Amino acid sequence: MDVLKILALTAFLVVLAGAGWLVGWVNTPAMPMQQALDFMQTTQEVKVDEGEYITFSGLNANNAKGIIFYPGGRVDPKAYAPLMFELAKRGAFTVIVPMPFNLAVFSPMSASRVIKRYPYIKDWYIAGHSLGGAMACSFVKNSAEDIAGLILLASYPAQGDDLSSNDLDVLSIYASNDGLATVQKIDSTKRLLPPQTVYYCIQGGNHTQFGWYLTQDGDGQADISRQQQQDELLSSILKFIRMKQ
């Protein structure tokens, strides 16, 4: 075998190995804790359905308001079940959108299909954690007329998704000990959000505790419990969408 063929074969094997590593990387998301899986069961208060989407519907609610949720990058969508369950228990219809390869960047416009599937919902909010929030911003940039509000959890818009001139209601919740979506990053991207944006900082919280999965590399150490962070998160969202706690 001549040198050129050897080099070509070597290059092919390197690319193949890299592709295999990438597929393995995107298909090994942070897995949900058992506490999250406990909220994947229908109860007397909330009906849970798992199909193309994971939906939570309060059995004694009118479900006039809906929340579409984009998970964080490489995080199993079930890790957000407790928050979506609690919101549904208080009257919201909540939808977690599983993403291709667990990365919302591959399907930022997924919310459009959700809205069409459930036409009886009067007011839709779109929310997302980390990368999911950034892609929710991308959706709003292109389809703001379909949305009543935007909820960002440890997230901010990409430079190309400037929403500063939008009149949409926006809630940005972040955490003081977040090592990934740091306070500095939140502050430096405020110029990309509308001036009426409501900001709420969870003191002592971190990036990982916005969901129910194990610690991410690079995150800061939380000074409060996961449950306390989740309670503050729930309370802030309910206030924003004007629902009783």
Predicted regions and their residues:
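Conserved alpha/beta-hydrolase
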Residues: 84-104
